[in-house]
Every structure is written in structure tokens, then in C-alpha cells.
Design a protein with these regions (language model features):
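Positively charged n-region of N-terminal signal peptides that target proteins for export
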Residues: 1-4
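Sec-dependent N-terminal signal peptides
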Residues: 6-13
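Long, low-complexity intrinsically disordered regions enriched in Ser/Thr, Asp/Glu, Pro/Gly
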Residues: 9, 20-22
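C-terminal motif of bacterial Sec signal peptides marking the signal peptidase cleavage site
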Residues: 15-18
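Sequence context surrounding c-type heme c attachment/ligation sites in exported
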Residues: 22-50, 55-60, 64-65, 77-161
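His/Cys-centered metal/cofactor-coordination and adjacent catalytic loops
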Residues: 67-69, 74
Length: 161
């Protein structure tokens, strides 16, 4: 009997461990901000350790307003889009380069449940190479351009369908 209970306990523990990484991100849409996001992507969970955008590894040609060249990283959540779009907690980090391939800025899309439903619930942030906040929140310059891709959850690079 003791062996059966011990076996059941082991199965339960293993099952719970398997679910730990699948929690839905519950960032508060009222308090999300660029300073905390920078700490997250530069220290706590460095974006440079994320995967490249699927099928696009390394620096590629860019265009305005992002720069002559870009390099795009995505966290694990952003690697799992569905027909409904990207899951909450998705982070898309784009390095924007000048023609001489000097890093000019970083532009971020962060999907936060309830943040801005009219614009796909994306929180937008722009940083200088040193982390200086150049813009954040419901940035109309970002929303205006990306709204033409509402059918792809406001994401340009490649279709997730």
C-alpha cells in the first residue's frame, strides 16, 4: 500500500512540475511600464537569450521607422501563436540598426491582457541602446502602422497562419 501511495505522489508531483511553465501571464494592465519591462528584458530574462524570429536568424534588411537593418527576438510565448493571435505574455524585441549597423534603438511589443483591446492588447516601448526610454504605452505611431495587420494580431514580419 505504501508503494502505491508513493507512486501516486510521484505522478502528482511530476504532473504539477509539467504545468508550471504553462501559467498564463497576468501582468496588471494598469501598472505595466517601460522601466519594469526594460529590467525584465535586460536583466531578469535577457532578450538576447530569446529565439530569433522563426525563419529569420540574425540581422536582416529593415525599413522605416525601424532602421536600415533589424534583428528580431521573441520569447517562448511568442513562438506559440494560434489562429486567434499571440498569447498574453508574448514579447517581440526588435533591434533597430543604422546603415553602418550601429544599434540605434530597440522597439518592443508586449502582449498584456486587457491593456488595449482595440489594438490587440499590445503595450509598445522604444528604448535607446542604453535602455533610455524614448516612448511607451499606447504609442499612436506604432498602433497606426501596425493596425493594418490587425488580421495578424498587429504583427508584420511573417504570418503565423
Amino acid at each position: 500500500m505504501h508503494k502505491i501511495l508513493l507512486s501516486l505522489l510521484m505522478v502528482l508531483i511530476i504532473s504539477l512540475c509539467g504545468c508550471a511553465g504553462k501559467e498564463e501571464v497576468t501582468e496588471d494592465p494598469e501598472t505595466v511600464n517601460a522601466a519594469d519591462l526594460w529590467k525584465r528584458i535586460s536583466q531578469d530574462d535577457p532578450y538576447t537569450e530569446y529565439a530569433f524570429w522563426p525563419g529569420v536568424e540574425g540581422i536582416m534588411d529593415g525599413n522605416a521607422p525601424h532602421g536600415a537593418f533589424i534583428q528580431t527576438f521573441v520569447n517562448d510565448k511568442a513562438l506559440e501563436p494560434t489562429e486567434a493571435g499571440y498569447p498574453y505574455g508574448s514579447l517581440i524585441v526588435k533591434e533597430n540598426y543604422m546603415p553602418d549597423k550601429t544599434l540605434a534603438k530597440l522597439t518592443i511589443m508586449y502582449k498584456v491582457k486587457g491593456y488595449d483591446p482595440q489594438s490587440g492588447d499590445w503595450f509598445w516601448a522604444v528604448y535607446g541602446p542604453d535602455g533610455t526610454i524614448e516612448g511607451e504605452g499606447r504609442m499612436q505611431s506604432c498602433i497606426g502602422c501596425h493596425s493594418v495587420r490587425a488580421d495578424q494580431d498587429h504583427v508584420f514580419l511573417k504570418s503565423y497562419r
